[in-house]
Amino acid sequence: MASPKETLQRRAARVRRQVKAVANGRPRLSVHRSSKNIYAQIIDDVRGVTLAAASTLDGDLKGKLKTGADSAAAAAVGKLVAERAVKAGVKDVVFDRSAFIYHGRVKALAEAAREGGLSF
């Protein structure tokens, strides 16, 4: 039987494989969620560069958030990464939730990024 860590890695690889199959050259919005913070970055896999990034540890958000581990913080990160992506000239992305289910903080980040101008 697979350990929880192996199961997580398998699920992340499966999602990433599906994302790359439908990307068609579009950058991906990659999300990482820890117990205390949430991170998002727009990655261009063709060139291998990060185009925009934001997290709850970011200087622009650090003092404004009550905690980095709630849906409000995730929404703030989503809005900030969308602003930075639009400023960098990126509007169409593919959402890469990694091994996390589309619920709670991950969903809040995605919806805020859509409101901020990203389409996926």
Swiss-Prot record:
Which SUPFAM superfamilies is this protein grouped with?
A: Translational machinery components
Q: Which cysteines are joined by disulfide bonds?
A: none
Q: Which domain of life is it from?
A: Bacteria
Q: Name one Pfam family in it.
A: Ribosomal_L18p
GO cellular component entries: cytosolic large ribosomal subunit
Keywords in alphabetical order, please: Ribonucleoprotein, Ribosomal protein, RNA-binding, rRNA-binding
Please verify whether the record's keywords include rRNA-binding. Answer: yes
Q: Which InterPro entries does this chain map to?
A: Ribosomal_uL18_bac-type, Ribosomal_uL18_bac/euk
Gene Ontology BP, a term: translation
Answer whether the UniProt record assigns the keyword rRNA-binding to this protein. Answer: yes
Instruction: Name one molecular function that GO assigns to this entry.
Output: 5S rRNA binding
Similarity-based family: Belongs to the universal ribosomal protein uL18 family.
Function description: This is one of the proteins that bind and probably mediate the attachment of the 5S RNA into the large ribosomal subunit, where it forms part of the central protuberance.
**Quaternary context:** Part of the 50S ribosomal subunit; part of the 5S rRNA/L5/L18/L25 subcomplex. Contacts the 5S and 23S rRNAs.
Stated name of the protein: Large ribosomal subunit protein uL18
Biological source species: Brucella suis biovar 1 (strain 1330)
